[in-house]
């Protein structure tokens, strides 16, 4: 199930910049194993959902999964073959802004080998380089 905010204060946003590293959401809080971003990127709600589904399918009802990012930024696209001007395009999809160091998914209640395999499958769905981390 694709996620997006129930309501926002403004319909459209500036694109913004992704400079620096993530100072929030870079520690494992809930689970034992996690997937951590190593590069900055926009991750779409479809990519987040694909990774989550891949992990749950591999774990087969075992363990618990937490998704630590939420797509709260609307990306606008103007219709094809439209002339320039006449305002900004309409919101097309939602993205989560991810900086290096950010934890994307967490997992607990499974063995390390299963967690490593499940998280590596989810990592293949991501548009960035990631690493597998274990809570101390």
From Swiss-Prot:
GO cellular component, one term: chloroplast
Keyword RNA-binding set for record: no
Alphabetized UniProt keyword annotations: Chloroplast, Plastid, Ribonucleoprotein, Ribosomal protein
Annotated GO biological process: mitochondrial translation
Pfam families named among the record's database cross-references: Ribosomal_L16
GO MF terms, alphabetically ordered: rRNA binding; structural constituent of ribosome
SUPFAM superfamilies noted in UniProt: Ribosomal protein L16p/L10e
Entry's family note: Belongs to the universal ribosomal protein uL16 family.
Protein's name in the database: Large ribosomal subunit protein uL16c
Organism per entry: Chloranthus spicatus (Chulantree)
